[in-house]
Every structure is written in C-alpha cells, then in structure tokens.
C-alpha cells in the first residue's frame, strides 16, 4: 500500500539530514497518515480512508460528503 493520502494526495518527499558538522545524508519525510472510518449519513454507511492529518482537517472544514464527491470526481473512491 502506497504512503499517499487519499484526500490531499500528499506523498513522501526526499530531503537531507544535516548534522552539526553540516554533513548531509538523504532521508524521506513521510506524511502523517492515519487509517480512519467516517460515517456518511447520506449513504448510511461507513467509509474507510487513509488520510493525512491535513486531510482530516480538510474533512472537518468541508465535510465528508463534499470530500467524497471530490474523490469520486477524480475516480479514487
């Protein structure tokens, strides 16, 4: 399973660890993904999504129905 948020599309990025001596080594910055279930009242069922914390905040702001409509328009759910 890919480490990608289903709502925002956030994925791992690549950067550097930087030591005190300014030595640089490659590292990955992973999104803060959570597996969450949301109850959709309009459909009277639960929907499971793998969302980042930013995706959870977006769902709180717009509502689960609007977010699911966007996902279905993109063909992801």
UniProtKB/Swiss-Prot annotation:
Q: Name one GO molecular function term.
A: structural constituent of ribosome
Q: Which domain of life is it from?
A: Bacteria
Gene Ontology terms: biological process? translation
Would I find Ribonucleoprotein among this entry's keywords?
A: yes
Q: One short Pfam family name for this protein?
A: Ribosomal_L28
- Name any GO cellular component annotation: cytosolic large ribosomal subunit
The UniProt keyword set, sorted, is:
Ribonucleoprotein, Ribosomal protein
Family label: Belongs to the bacterial ribosomal protein bL28 family.
State what protein this is by name. Large ribosomal subunit protein bL28
């Amino acid at each position: 399973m890919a480490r990608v948020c289903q709502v925002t599309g956030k994925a791992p990025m690549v950067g550097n660890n930087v030591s005190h001596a300014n030595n640089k080594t490659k590292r990955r910055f992973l999104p803060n993904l959570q597996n969450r279930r949301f109850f959709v009242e309009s459909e009277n069922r639960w929907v499971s999504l793998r969302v980042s914390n930013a995706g959870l905040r977006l769902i709180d702001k717009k509502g689960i129905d609007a977010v699911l409509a966007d996902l279905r328009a993109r063909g992801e759910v």
